[in-house]
Amino acid sequence: MDYTNCKLYRIKSKKSLKYIIKIRDKKYYKQSLIAKEYNVFIDENFKPRLVEAPSYELKQIQRSIKLQLNQIKVPDYVFSGVKGKSYYDNALIHKGNKYVYKIDLTAFFPCIPRDYVYLFFINELNTSPDIANILTNLTTVDLTLCSIKNVQKVETFYMQKKLRNSNHLATGSPTSPILSYLVNIPMFDELYDLSSKNNIVMTIYADDVTFSSSNKISYQIKTMVNKIVTKYQYKISKPKVKSYTKNYPKLITGVVLDRNGNPVPRNSMRLKVKKEITELKLHPEKSKKRLQGLLTAIRQVNPGQYQNLYKFAKE
């Protein structure tokens, strides 16, 4: 892996770091102070999910770090956190393959400990220890230092997911999707090598790993996938494991590929559009923004749909 295009490579001074990632306040050097910049809660709208949302200023610094990390050339199988690639592109790679096997890594970001991130900055980007420490502080969060409104819900989530790392890759940071790959290159490369040797296409989109082939993906391959993931101390979410055969539509990172491999909008997305249309009268501004987001996602799959409604939502 070539890291030389990344301006964070071999950074040794705070002055240089401050200039590159636009740090305006020294409080962003210390994790104890950075922790106060997070709003931590459990989102229960769809399924329980740990949210660690950074403040506006912290998020701007994280975006600057992401900008530099995006200069690192990653393999074609990586789709999350990569400029110019999306969940839609990730799904299209598997178009035409009859068999699909999907896995989801359980609570992936919270399972990536601070140490992994620190070792990436110091060993791979060759920064000095103090710079590696600052960059790690900016991209991870220590929940023991955060002001959490509902601690009990967070503790319950941790118990249910059997999580151990209170200090981990921050779920709401713009840097997390690409860092989740960069700190786990050995695992993902091992999965990719297994796939390549068996004529299987593999892609990763954050915690979603998708395998597809024109031939049936054997039980032995699936067992090997599980062994590799377990070897690196991660877990596969059993309820989210999906196998699709040639006669069924395939759902990949939110995109449905029909029996012929063509992308089609999900029925749930259409239902959400109908719901937002009825909500327009009650909450016009909020509903209009949500409607625009939904229609943008649908039109990415089918550009011809909802043309007039899309124009209205953009006004």
Where are the predicted features?
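Catalytic palm active-site di-aspartate
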Residues: 102-106, 172, 176, 197-214
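Right-hand nucleic-acid polymerase module
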Residues: 1-133, 137-173, 181-193, 217-315
